[in-house]
Amino acid sequence: MHDESRTKQISSIKALLKKWEHEYVHTNNCKPSKEDVKKQPEIALLYKQYYELKRESSITPKKAKTKVDFKFQTPTKQRAETEANESPKAPRNDYLQVTPKTVDKSLLGPTPQLSRRVLNLLEDMSPIADSHVDQISDIKHNTSEISSTMIPTTPSKNPEPVAQHTPTVLETPSSYRLQVYTSPNLLRVNAPCRKSLSEMLRELKDIEDDYGSNEEKILQEFESFSSSSSESLVDRDISQPMKKKIKRQNRLVKLPPSMNLSKSHLEGLPEIDEDAENGIDDNEDTTASKDSSPFLDLQSERQNKKIMRNGLVIGKQVSQNYSSYKLKKRKFRRHRS
């Protein structure tokens, strides 16, 4: 109900303010500013009321806490409720609340008394010990305990019997006595075996003498092998020098021998007339019939036929402008590419 009355009041004040704003715009042709509102106190009061009511309505009311039913929850530890500003209490001194009978005898109050009996100041008082002496004795006691526990000793299976005093006649002389340790002294560190510089140099020289000869032999063999290999390489280079050839840039084609068709081979031959040739033939026939020697005929034919020039066989010359040729057989044939 309170909210409804507030909303009604806000709407009524808003209507009055809007009415005044419209009138002001109609008369002055501009909206009112803050200074114009302050000049009219009634309108300023209405604005103030309007903004206060608006702010109160915008605040949301807090929700009321609802009580939780603890029947359906696990039990929790109940802590004592203490206020936040409450400081913790100081611890109480129990000696102030104790009766004199139960008071510790070592406790002395303002007046020295023990079980309601006044004490003398020098009674039951122990002398003050020096703190420095106590510290030294504690240190010695601790070091003795540490030294006894540092050396580990194993328990012996057959414990030695209690030593009894033997007569001096049966005792071993002191020169032959040896001290036997039951357990090794782990704290003692054996010093490493040290050598002098001269001994180390002597050992190095002995090692060099032993192994130096072998090294020299190996070096000589290696040098001889390297020199022989270099000489062989030099000889091979001299005997077979490497030459860089230009790569062939044209196609290799094998052609047959060129035929020289010029008649230069006929220049040295004598001219033969047909009449003389016929007459020579007649004479040859008569001489052949007379001599009847076939060997001479074959020899004359070879002389006439086998005149070789530029691969051509020349026969008998018929005339000055004509000569017979016989081509030799070719040894290879040109393949077409």
Curated annotation (Swiss-Prot):
One Pfam assignment: Drc1-Sld2
Subunit relationships: Interacts with rad4.
Effect of T60A: Decrease in phosphorylation by cdc2; no interaction with rad4
BP term (GO), one: double-strand break repair via break-induced replication
Compartmental location: Cytoplasm; Nucleus
UniProt similarity note: Belongs to the SLD2 family.
Naturally occurring in which organism (per UniProt): Schizosaccharomyces pombe (strain 972 / ATCC 24843)
Role: Has a role in the initiation of DNA replication. Required at S-phase checkpoint.
Protein name in the entry: DNA replication regulator sld2
Gene: drc1
PANTHER family recorded: DNA REPLICATION REGULATOR SLD2
GO CC annotations on file: cytoplasm; DNA replication preinitiation complex; nuclear replication fork; nucleus
Residue positions where Phosphothreonine is found in the record: T60, T74, T99, T154
Composition bias type Acidic residues, residue spans: 270-285
PTM info: Phosphorylated by cdc2 at the onset of S-phase.
